[in-house]
Amino acid sequence: MEAQQVAEARAGAGAAPTEDLPTRATAVAAVAANHAIAVDSAARFPAEAFQAVRAKRLLGIQVPKALGGEGLGIGDVADVCYQLGQACGSTGMIFAMHQIKVACIMRHMGENATLQRMLRRLCAEQLLLASSTTEGQGGGNIRSSEAPVEHQEGGRITLERKASVISYGAYADGVVTTARRAADAVASDQVLVAFFKSDYTLTRLQGWDALGMRGTCSEGYTLKASASAEQIIPEP
């Protein structure tokens, strides 16, 4: 049923929104509130809320209009996060984490055509991005990465990292992850890489019986990815 709901939401994702942002956010918040208790009790992904998020085209609201988004500001994004979070903590947190990753790509992509195409696709298909910044023994030290980006022939890269936590990783359409710049780089010499789901596989390592915001489905995974080197997010 969940897969069917997502498919139905994406079927209409290309249509431009006809309602203003507050109206759309209010509608999504109502759906999130209706399922908040079930989401937290069962520690399950808020599928109904994100069906509504996609239907109301909220995932690309801060992306520039030239790339298919609405070009809205961080204040607008914060308002939606606040409204969704009041209705369902997990829904609000997932939406906020997604928007942070979108903002990272926007801030640093420059003239990178590959990343621009990723944002176009995100808006057109209403794709959800996850974040992977914790790893192995590093725990909460997001300024240290064990796993290096490995450069291959033909402008390709590979990455294999043990992520101690990827929130909603099994439900996301892509992930933005930290990695060591290269095998001979120090652990603090990091890059960010953006992958679509077709670029990687996830193998579950561990669960997390969380207290609060249980619908974020934060679990540990081994992430194995192969993609274009152009998906490394440029430095400012």
Predicted features along the sequence, with ranges:
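Glycine-rich flavin
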Residues: 47, 51-54, 60-167
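A generic structural signal for well-ordered coil/turn residues at beta-strand boundaries
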Residues: 127, 143-145, 171-173, 189, ...
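A glycine-rich, basic-preceded beta-loop-alpha segment at the flavin cofactor/substrate interface
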Residues: 224-236
